[in-house]
């Protein structure tokens, strides 16, 4: 597992309000040196989310999808499904920029 790798993420059991529902992909955004922790920071994706400066578009499994930087969350690595590949370098840079925007860095 490395930063920028994409995994299938099963749906949460208790989503509320505007939290994402349904199975989707998740991009690992945690720094590689912290991947040994018991939890993992990921940003979920959506094919139906509206375009925004903090939602970079990436290609996953041949389909355009948006990374929801504003919904970055912590998951137990055991919740992740199989790896679906890795983001291209330019896509990961776009995710980094979105995270900086959302976090005010």
Where are these regions (language model features)?
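Conserved functional hotspots at enzyme active or ligand-binding sites that engage polyanionic ligands
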Residues: 1-105
